[in-house]
């Protein structure tokens, strides 16, 4: 029997909505990255974008375990000498709660064109509402 390789024309994508309230950041991010990549499907092919669209609501209610809410710091650099910026988790949660989850998922995806394309299928909203009712998303309950 030959190995099955999915073609881009054979891909069928679903829309899933995930409620992030009370969920642990890393565990939720791994399940989202699996959905985006398509690894939950029996037709998974590494070189083909066969994943689904994911909508995450209530990103502001995501949880970290232990002392990470007080200790975690996000870093970015401007590219200039002395241009290192530090943002504590609590400040990032207050200003941009959707960036926390997007960054965690982004770092779990491939670091190439495929990863950037997969990340474009992720929609994150801080509150409980989203404008994607026309796509009829299915509720996804993370295991």
Swiss-Prot record:
The keyword Metal-binding does not apply. GO terms for biological process: negative regulation of translation; translation. GO terms for cellular component: cytosolic large ribosomal subunit. Keywords: Ribonucleoprotein, Ribosomal protein. GO terms for molecular function: mRNA binding; structural constituent of ribosome. Part of the 50S ribosomal subunit. It holds the Pfam family Ribosomal_L13. It comes from Chloroflexus aggregans (strain MD-66 / DSM 9485). Belongs to the universal ribosomal protein uL13 family. Signal peptide: none annotated. It comes from the Bacteria. The keyword Transmembrane helix does not apply. The gene is rplM. This is Large ribosomal subunit protein uL13. This protein is one of the early assembly proteins of the 50S ribosomal subunit, although it is not seen to bind rRNA by itself. It is important during the early stages of 50S assembly. InterPro entries: Ribosomal_uL13 (IPR005822), Ribosomal_uL13_bac-type (IPR005823), Ribosomal_uL13_CS (IPR023563), Ribosomal_uL13_sf (IPR036899).
